[in-house]
Amino acid sequence: DLLSSHTEVWGKATLTDTGFTLVGKADRVDVLHDGTARIYDYKTGPLPSVAQQLHFDKQLLLEAEILQRGGFDSLNVLQVAEATYIGVGNELKLAKAPLGEDEVWVKFSELIKSYQNPNQGYTARRAMLMVDVPSDYDQLARYGEWGTNEHPLLIKT
């Protein structure tokens, strides 16, 4: 059922109400004979659970939304059959994305709209899986000089 396979495919989709364009690169997209596509993302670390994908790790879900909006121009496909994380550690693992279980594009649009409001402050730890686990960006954000119970302070420059 495989028609063609494409690696490192760039795509983009624009939120019509804000003009914001989301750009992303899919690790692999397989186009099937029935006109649908399978999207794959390779991971060397732990694969996200369904709950993590719905709340924190929306990469594949957003790539699927880009594809459904015609954002992968070179593929000419508008329907996603499946989106899957592939773990490439010591043993092969698969984790399917929960397509259709969440209003991903609507929620993404709402998030972007909120940050386009000049009165909305930015926070370094907006949606942490576990607050007590260090983030790759904690040092950059100077975490430790402030706490997670503090609201971001808007400083106009």
Model-derived features: positions:
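RecB-family 4Fe-4S metal-dependent nuclease core
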Residues: D1-T157
